[in-house]
């Protein structure tokens, strides 16, 4: 996975976009 996508996922937390 892309680092950016991973970062966003971490920030999103429970919310998976």
Swiss-Prot record:
It is found in: Secreted. One of its GO terms (cellular component) is extracellular region. The lineage of its organism: Eukaryota, Metazoa, Chordata, Craniata, Vertebrata. Expressed in skin glands. It comes from the Eukaryota. Keywords: Secreted. Belongs to the Frog skin active peptide (FSAP) family. Septenin subfamily. Signal peptide: none annotated. This is Septenin 1f. May act as an antimicrobial peptide. It comes from Osteopilus septentrionalis (Cuban treefrog).
